[in-house]
């Protein structure tokens, strides 16, 4: 038996001028642009700092994305223990971090997909954030499996999937297509999902508000 999962698709709509500039970007260039975007970094960091329970933030690139996320989340959540895990962290330290989280609450782990998508069992993981785009079905489902362990401290687990919308006209950006594929995975696995789409400024505004909640999301199919 597994913990029920609720998926929250948080769609970041970029300004029209940005979408136009990125319309013909190669996949690698688009990903580079997104993971180094300062406003995106701030939005994801605020999401992590405000998320409930023990939180796992997953990223792809250590130096240009993971470490800046870790630093900013520490600044935003000084009252919480924030841990960093990548291939640079040895197995003993990873195990110590796992035990801290397993025995605590309101812990935040900022970890690379490669080190945390498989092989680490933390039953009391409450919230997971996909901070980097990922199109691998196996990686997505393995990562989700980290949060589905049963634990008395949770009635469900929450996945925050950050979606980057650079669409303009008929042009659909690479990472948005990958997000559409992830939604197909969620549907196939019968994970209920909600969606909230806001411009970057609106995301910053909503997350800066002390009463802000990611629960304002619009349920799939609703107007």
Where are each of the predicted segments found?
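Hydrophobic residues at beta-strand termini and immediately following loops
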Residues: 10, 85
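Conserved beta-strand elements of the Class I
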Residues: 56-58, 83, 129
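A conserved SF2-helicase RecA2
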Residues: 1-4, 16-18, 141, 149-216, ...
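Conserved RecA-like P-loop NTPase helicase motor core
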Residues: 87-185
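Short helix-loop-beta junction
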Residues: 73-80, 188-191
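Conserved interdomain hinge at the start of the Helicase C-terminal
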Residues: 21-60, 64-75
């Amino acid at each position: 038996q597994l913990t029920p999962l609720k998926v929250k698709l948080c769609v970041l709509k970029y300004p029209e001028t940005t979408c136009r500039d990125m319309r013909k970007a190669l996949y690698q260039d688009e990903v580079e642009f997104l993971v180094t975007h300062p406003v995106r970094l701030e939005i994801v960091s605020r999401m992590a700092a405000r998320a409930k329970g023990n939180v796992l933030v997953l990223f792809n690139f250590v130096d240009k994305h993971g470490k800046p996320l870790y630093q900013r989340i520490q600044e935003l959540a000084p009252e919480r223990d924030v841990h960093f895990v990548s291939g640079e962290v040895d197995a003993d330290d990873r195990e110590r971090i796992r035990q801290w989280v397993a025995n605590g609450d309101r812990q935040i782990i900022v970890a690379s997909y490669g080190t945390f998508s498989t092989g680490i069992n933390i039953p009391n993981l409450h919230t997971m954030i996909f901070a980097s785009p990922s199109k691998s079905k196996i990686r997505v489902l393995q990562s989700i499996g980290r949060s589905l362990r049963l634990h008395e401290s949770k009635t469900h687990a929450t996945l925050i999937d950050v979606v980057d919308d650079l669409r303009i006209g008929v042009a659909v950006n690479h990472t948005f297509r990958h997000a559409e594929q992830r939604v197909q995975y969620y549907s196939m696995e019968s994970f209920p999902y909600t969606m909230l789409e806001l411009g970057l400024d609106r995301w910053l505004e909503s997350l800066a508000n002390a009463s802000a909640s990611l629960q304002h999301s619009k349920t799939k199919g609703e107007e």
